[in-house]
C-alpha cells in the first residue's frame, strides 16, 4: 500500500504547506486586528461625544420653551417682561421667570404666588419649594429649584431692571440679539430669584467656568431660535450679541 506523502511529518512538502497555513492564519489575524483597531479609532470619539450631544438636546428644548414663552409674553404686552418687579420702595420682588409661568402652561403655579410679597417670603414658601423642570438643565445636576437659565441683563440688554423693554426698540435682526443664556452652575440662582446674567458674567464666561456642556453653552435669541455658542467666543462678538439696541450686524459664521 502506497503511503500518503502528506501524512508524514518529515515530508518537506507537508512542512511547507503547514508553515504556509500558519503564515496565512497569522496574516488574517493581523489584518482583522488592524481593521478592528481602525473601527475603534473612528467610532470611539463619536461614542464619547454622543452622551454630551444627547445631554445638550433636553437643555436646548428647555431653552426653546423658555425663549418662546418670553416672546409670547412680549406679544401680549408689547414689551419683554421686566427683569424683576419691585415694591413701592424699589425693593426687588419677583423674576421674569415667574411672570412667564402662564406662557409655560404653569397657570396654577403662577396663581399660587403672592406677587405683592418677595419671592422668598414665607407666603410664597410652597412655590419656592416647587421645582419647575423647564428651568433645570438635566446635565447641570442642580436641585432645590436652582436654574442656570438667566436673562440677558447686560447694559442695553433685553431685561432692563424693573422697566419692560418694548419690542419695537429692540435691534433688528432679532437673530443677533441674545435673550436667555445658560450659565455655569457657579452662577445658578433659584428660579424665583430676581437675579440674572449681567455684563460681567456674559463677557467673562469662558473655558475656566464649569459649563454643564463641555466647551459650549446654549442660548436663546429674540427670533426664537436656540443655538450653541463656544465658551471661547470673541469678546467683540459677545458685546454685539448682548446689545438689544446695537446697530452692528454680525456675520452668522462668527458665532
Task: Annotate each predicted stretch with a short phrase.
Residues 1-17:
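N-terminal intrinsically disordered, acidic low-complexity segments at the extreme N-terminus
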Residues 4, 20-23, 166:
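Positively charged, low-complexity intrinsically disordered regions
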Residues 10-13, 34, 188:
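A ubiquitous, low-specificity "background" feature that marks scattered single residues
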Residues 13, 17-19, 152, 243:
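Residue-level detector of intrinsically disordered, flexible termini
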Residues 17-61, 65-69, 75, 79:
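Amphipathic alpha-helical segments typified by the pilin-like N-terminal helix
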Residues 55-255:
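Surface-exposed loop/linker segments characteristic of extracytoplasmic
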Amino acid at each position: 500500500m502506497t503511503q500518503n506523502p502528506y501524512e508524514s511529518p518529515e515530508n518537506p512538502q507537508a512542512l511547507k504547506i503547514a508553515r504556509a497555513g500558519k503564515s496565512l492564519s497569522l496574516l488574517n489575524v493581523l489584518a482583522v486586528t488592524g481593521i478592528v483597531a481602525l473601527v475603534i479609532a473612528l467610532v470611539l470619539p463619536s461614542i464619547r461625544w454622543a452622551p454630551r450631544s444627547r445631554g445638550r438636546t433636553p437643555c436646548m428644548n428647555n431653552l426653546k420653551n423658555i425663549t418662546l414663552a418670553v416672546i409670547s409674553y412680549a406679544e401680549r404686552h408689547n414689551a419683554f417682561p421686566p427683569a424683576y418687579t419691585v415694591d413701592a420702595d424699589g425693593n426687588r420682588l419677583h423674576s421674569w421667570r415667574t411672570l412667564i409661568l402662564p406662557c409655560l402652561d404653569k397657570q396654577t403655579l403662577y396663581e399660587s404666588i403672592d406677587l405683592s410679597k418677595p419671592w422668598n417670603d414665607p407666603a410664597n414658601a410652597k412655590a419656592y419649594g416647587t421645582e419647575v423642570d423647564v428651568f433645570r438643565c438635566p446635565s447641570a445636576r442642580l436641585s432645590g429649584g436652582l436654574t442656570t437659565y438667566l436673562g440677558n441683563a447686560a447694559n442695553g440688554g433685553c431685561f432692563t431692571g424693573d422697566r419692560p423693554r418694548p419690542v419695537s426698540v429692540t435691534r433688528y435682526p432679532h437673530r443677533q440679539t441674545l435673550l436667555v443664556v445658560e450659565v455655569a452652575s457657579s452662577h445658578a440662582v433659584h428660579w424665583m430669584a430676581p437675579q440674572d446674567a449681567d455684563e460681567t458674567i456674559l463677557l467673562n464666561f469662558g473655558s475656566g467656568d464649569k459649563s454643564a456642556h463641555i466647551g459650549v453653552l446654549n442660548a436663546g435669541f429674540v427670533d426664537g431660535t436656540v443655538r450653541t455658542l463656544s465658551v471661547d467666543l470673541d469678546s467683540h462678538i459677545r458685546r454685539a450679541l448682548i446689545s438689544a439696541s446695537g446697530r452692528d450686524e454680525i456675520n452668522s459664521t462668527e458665532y
